[in-house]
Amino acid sequence: METSILKTAVKNFLGNSPDWYKLAIIIFLIINPLIFFFINPFVTGWLLVIEFIFTLAMALKCYPLQPGGLLAIEAVIIGMTSPQQVGHEIANNLEVVLLLIFMVAGIYFMKQLLLFAFTKLLLSIKSKRMLALAFCLASAFLSAFLDALTVIAVVISVSLGFYSIYNNFITDQNDVINAKHDNHIDTAKKKQTLEQFRAFLRSLMMHAGVGTALGGVMTMVGEPQNLIIAKNVNWDFVTFFIRMAPITLPVFICGLLVCFLVEHFKLFGYGTELPERVRQVLEDYDKKTSAKRTHKEKAQLIAQALIGIWLIVALAFHLAEVGLIGLSVIILTTSFCGITEEHALGKAFEEALPFTALLTVFFSIVAVIVDQQLFTPFIQFVLQVSETSQLSLFYLFNGLLSSVSDNVFVGTVYINEARTAMQEGLISHKQFEYLAVAINTGTNLPSVATPNGQAAFLFLLTSTLSPLIRLSYGRMVIMALPYTIVMTLVGLLCVEFLLIPVTDMMVHWGLIALP
């Protein structure tokens, strides 16, 4: 009896995850305290970061909340950080938490409008290259005014809608979320078409994801860390855009060029066309829904469009915290679309809350990074070199650390360290402003390398869409690789050779004023 209970308990641990994965997590939990107490806390800190990245990489084997959460709880228990520091990190990032809870749910209630708009876009543009550019451009434009997580939530919602339409057509299975295996598909031809459609959606999702980085780096509201950096150097919306332009505009152009080339030459998993059969299904669906659209549904679309305008205006002018704007979207859409039942409201939060919990665990890891001073050696090294080398090194170290850590945290740490150096007289105010540009671009551009570098990518990886279209951590890294290389190198070259002369030119033209 006791043996069977023990076996069941072992089997219950991390559920249906592979045995080797369960064993790896147990080994991590055993060795971390030993290394912390008997070898070196600093080494343990970096080991914990690597282990957490491992749980993210294996997201399709087991949702990272459980294994990552166990590692974080143990880190607090053994003294790598404190509950107070974890609470402090969560408080510092409350805006992001509110964004996830309310904004993503708000977008859920605008799904009807978004599916309508993106279906028209998808069906009206026949060329895959042009469609990829359209998705990338749309994501970049929206991310300049909205948060990247909001934009990626929109695109996930739309892609899930496309997938649902075709999945329901080829099967009798209406619950697309549970249709993660292909056993319900009766012919090889249908399976082949579905695989092609998955590849098509994967490429669109990655183009859209990179688009959020290309647009998000440009403005002070594009990413949470942008706002923090802008406040430190006292830049307004227009000044921030102009000061970033010597790096962001060339990177944006090169990013769009990469988008076109990988589609044209079918590289890194891109280039798959929309299957003609799927296009036909989507066109038929669009015609049927248009023909059957009632006055009530038309009124709902108009209401959602007006609320969408409110959303963009409110975010662009930062009329309130992003999460509170999201809450207003929930209230307005549900009020004017007639959604008043509690269970209907609850569905909107199903997508975001697991990721919100995961991000909170991530803040626990960030608390360890702070308490164990894991980034201190990098910062001290950079501040010791000459001013001309500081810009490139700040950019590179920000990019490297943002690829393995939260880019909000990295940007905040580096801008605070740069400000402290200025206050202590180690660097001039002019150099501080140049460093702010290097820090902002460094945290936003190279961090597309891995899903844990960009919160939007991590949200995509852990969404219900990823297993449906077979978008794993490894595949995301590979598909992001051409963008990572080009955006990082072009950004570095612009920081090294264009930032100072172009800024001086803009000062001469009277566009900006240097201290």
Curated annotation (Swiss-Prot):
Reaction(s) this enzyme catalyzes, per UniProt: 2 Na(+)(in) + 3 H(+)(out) = 2 Na(+)(out) + 3 H(+)(in)
Organism, as annotated: Photorhabdus laumondii subsp. laumondii (strain DSM 15139 / CIP 105565 / TT01)
Gene name for this UniProt entry: nhaB
Localization: Cell inner membrane
HAMAP family tied to this protein: NhaB (MF_01599)
The name this protein goes by in its record: Na(+)/H(+) antiporter NhaB
Gene Ontology MF terms in the entry: sodium:proton antiporter activity
Function: Na(+)/H(+) antiporter that extrudes sodium in exchange for external protons.
InterPro entries reported for this sequence: Na+/H+_antiporter_NhaB
Primary subcellular site in the record, as a coarse category: membrane
Keywords (A to Z) from UniProt: Antiport, Cell inner membrane, Cell membrane, Ion transport, Membrane, Sodium, Sodium transport, Transmembrane, Transmembrane helix, Transport
Assigned protein family: Belongs to the NhaB Na(+)/H(+) (TC 2.A.34) antiporter family.
One Pfam match: NhaB
Topology in the lipid bilayer: Multi-pass membrane protein
Entry's transmembrane regions: 23-43, 45-65, 96-116, 136-156, 204-224, 245-265, 305-325, 349-369, 393-413, 449-469, 480-500
GO cellular component: plasma membrane
